[in-house]
């Protein structure tokens, strides 16, 4: 059964200010809710198992609490406002009006109803939800949430972040499949994008496909002006609500991908686009048919329903191709774009064949492009992941038909694998100005060629990933301006987190394998021969790189010219990955 979807919350400044005051007073934070739940229940909830959390807060939903909130039988903390708010807005429980009134003294129950975040509960359904079997019954003084209102915590170099993010109620709270227009809260992909986005002071930031607005909120801490776009009017309503609740200024525009910002350039573009590859026929649909580019009339029988937060209404991975082909024109000189995405691998292609084809034009224009594949699934695994995400399990009668639809779609393009990862683009200050920006450019030097780097990395080390990737982009730019003679004349240092790992057969003197292992960043492991390992080990800034290579060759009787020619590209790679520093 699919959940009904209520109207989006209303943007009423006075009531939002009262709600904010109540949330602050209640200490409705991630840390506080985890204290209330305990380690076991909090951990289970992160795995999307709400049962331990419901047990921990069960006294709040006891029938005795409806007529007499003082009768709540449990620890004092369970009767506190943070517990009430969490049970109501995250677990989807029906709670006594009196308890809610105590938790929201400034806003009040009526104010919460006017905002569109609460409604009277009707008993008979799960957790007091409307029951078609008893439509005339009344709740006896209980209310339920119309939105998920979750605390959010993060930290950047400007300090601790504590926000609240409103979105549509999750499947966990409603017990029903998601509505096609569902607006997602802060999911795993949102957290990933927030972790990899550079956090540096900039002028203009664009969030493409903003959803409930979390990336725009993060960007506001470093930008003078943030613009967030989405095709979904409902998503923009939630984003506006969240910006106002958290006292953040964001300009919101409705439209598909980059259409709302035609002719404009930005210093930073972030996007968690609806990249999920879903059976949608063989060609892109006209976006005028509906918010996801499809309509009920042109959806084939057995074709999965579209969810606007994940489905872009395009065939295969063409939405990502479309977005990446258009992005460069919107990057100002020195500007960076960071996004997540999926790409298909067909037939005997290399995993990066599609990203390379999409980014060839950007590279030719002088941009630096970096694709990092973090995960890969076969077609069956991918289908299972996203059918489950839509609320269908293997026990559901629709499961075989849905899986078959995905596999048939992949077979039509001979897809053998699907990758997930990061795409980063940077327009160097010296690269040719974009068409949109050319009227403001005095004519920059576009002679420096662009670069295109792809790698598969699955690890994560210590440190801040956003800073690590930003440093890598700067190093790509720096090295592109440095010839081999300049590099050889540089004094390099090995990174403090770098170690060498040697594999030896028992009793052998010489290693069968040498690896350079990174402790920070993406925790890369790079195979090395004796010459590279010896060179890296000696790079402490005392000698130049060229002198160090010459010394290693003298000790090993290796040919200096051949060794240098072989090692310099490897050293460049180690500089980009942060294993070496200039």
Write out the residue ranges for each language-model feature.
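Intrinsically disordered, low-complexity terminal tails and inter-domain linkers enriched
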Residues: 63-79, 123-141, 284-303, 431-456, ...
């Amino acid at each position: 059964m699919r959940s009904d979807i209520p109207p989006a919350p209303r943007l009423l400044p006075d009531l939002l200010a009262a709600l904010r005051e109540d949330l602050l007073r209640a200490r409705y934070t991630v840390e506080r809710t985890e204290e209330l739940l305990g380690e076991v229940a909090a951990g289970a909830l992160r795995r999307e198992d709400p049962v331990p959390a419901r047990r921990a807060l069960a006294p709040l939903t006891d029938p005795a609490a409806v007529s007499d909130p003082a009768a709540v039988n449990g620890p004092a903390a369970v009767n506190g406002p943070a517990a009430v708010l969490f049970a109501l807005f995250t677990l989807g429980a029906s709670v006594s009006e009196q308890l809610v009134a105590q938790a929201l003294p400034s806003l009040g129950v009526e104010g919460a109803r006017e905002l569109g975040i609460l409604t009277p509960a009707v008993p008979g359904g799960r957790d007091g939800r409307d029951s078609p079997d008893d439509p005339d019954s009344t709740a006896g003084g209980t209310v339920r949430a119309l939105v998920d209102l979750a605390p959010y915590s993060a930290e950047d170099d400007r300090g601790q972040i504590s926000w609240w993010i409103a979105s549509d109620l999750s499947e966990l709270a409603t017990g029903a499949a998601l509505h096609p227009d569902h607006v997602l809260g802060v999911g795993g992909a949102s957290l990933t994008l927030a972790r990899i986005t550079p956090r540096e002071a900039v002028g203009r930031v664009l969030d493409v496909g903003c959803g409930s607005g979390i990336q725009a909120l993060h960007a506001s801490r470093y930008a003078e002006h943030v613009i967030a776009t989405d095709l979904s009017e409902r998503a923009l309503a939630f984003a506006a609500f969240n910006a106002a609740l958290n006292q953040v200024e964001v300009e919101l525009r409705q439209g598909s991908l980059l259409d709302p910002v035609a002719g404009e350039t930005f210093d930073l573009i972030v996007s968690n686009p609806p990249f999920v590859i879903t059976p949608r026929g063989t060609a892109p649909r006209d976006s005028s048919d509906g918010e996801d580019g499809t309509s009920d009339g042109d959806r084939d029988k057995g074709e999965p329903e579209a969810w606007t937060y994940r489905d872009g209404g395009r065939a295969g991975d063409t939405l990502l191709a479309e977005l990446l082909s258009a992005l460069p024109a919107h990057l100002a000189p020195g500007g960076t774009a960071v996004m997540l995405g999926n790409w298909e691998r067909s037939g005997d292609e290399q995993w990066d064949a599609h990203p390379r084809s999409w980014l060839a034009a950007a590279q030719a224009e002088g941009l630096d492009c970096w694709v990092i594949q973090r995960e890969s699934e076969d077609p069956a695994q991918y289908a299972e992941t996203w059918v489950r995400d839509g609320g269908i399990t293997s026990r559901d009668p629709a499961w075989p038909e849905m899986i078959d639809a995905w596999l048939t779609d992949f077979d039509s393009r001979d897809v053998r694998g699907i990758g997930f990862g990061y795409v980063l683009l940077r327009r160097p200050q010296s690269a040719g100005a974009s068409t949109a920006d050319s009227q403001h450019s005095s004519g920059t030097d576009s002679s420096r060629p662009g670069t295109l780097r792809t790698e598969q990395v699955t690890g994560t080390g210590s440190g801040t990933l956003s800073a690590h990737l930003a440093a890598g982009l700067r190093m790509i730019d720096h090295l592109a301006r440095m010839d081999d003679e300049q590099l050889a004349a540089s004094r390099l240092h090995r990174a403090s987190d770098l170690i060498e790992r040697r594999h030896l057969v028992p009793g052998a003197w010489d290693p069968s394998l040498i690896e350079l292992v990174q402790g920070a960043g993406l925790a890369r492991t790079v195979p090395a021969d004796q010459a590279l390992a010896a060179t890296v080990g000696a790079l402490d800034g005392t000698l130049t790189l060229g002198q160090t290579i010459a010394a290693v060759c003298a000790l090993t009787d290796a040919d200096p010219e051949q060794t240098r020619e072989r090692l310099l590209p490897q050293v460049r790679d180690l500089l980009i990955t942060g294993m070496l520093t200039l």
